[in-house]
Amino acid sequence: MSNKIAVFASGTGSNFDAIMNAVESGELDAEVCLLVSDNIKAGVIEKAQKREVDTVVYHPKSFSDKKAYESALLADCRDKGVEWIILAGYMRLIGPTLLEAYHNRIINIHPSLLPAFPGKDAIGQAVAKKVKVTGVTVHFVDDGMDTGPIIAQEAITITESDKKEEVQKKIQAVEHKLYPRVIQSLLTKEEAK
């Protein structure tokens, strides 16, 4: 039986596509049963709808506080039987309501070799610092920004001539292979327990 996962995303959805492609090819034994977004204009919403994935979009400012916002998300996740939450370009910190309900079952992908360049625009930060190596990190989510325990990392090289767009393409190529592989590894370990 496939593990039920929810993908949380705020942007274009390239990692969502990679996860869905891995599910469809059989590389990832999971069912993406829910897409959660906080951005009504996010490209990922259309991608999820085309693939007939149930989608909810909530604007956090529509709620009295973060707890109320996350309580609504938690209710949706529980309603769908979600076992894991996969952050894929979700631009909000996860708070105690979801962290407690999904302890060690929320993971994130970040476009740097953490702890270097946490937060927004990690690729831009790496290019500005003229580093020769950056990469991708998959980590468990805790209450900090990109501070949870690291699960996997993969490096890429940056040449002197690489612009931000070229580095982003290299990063995404790694993300789209690494994330489904790590998700499957975690699901397999969970099933073995």
Predicted segment positions?
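Amphipathic, non-transmembrane alpha-helical secondary structure
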Residues: 17-21, 46, 71-78, 177-180, ...
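Donor/substrate-binding cores of folate-linked one-carbon enzymes
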Residues: 22, 91-190
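N-terminal Rossmann-like dinucleotide-binding module
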Residues: 1-43
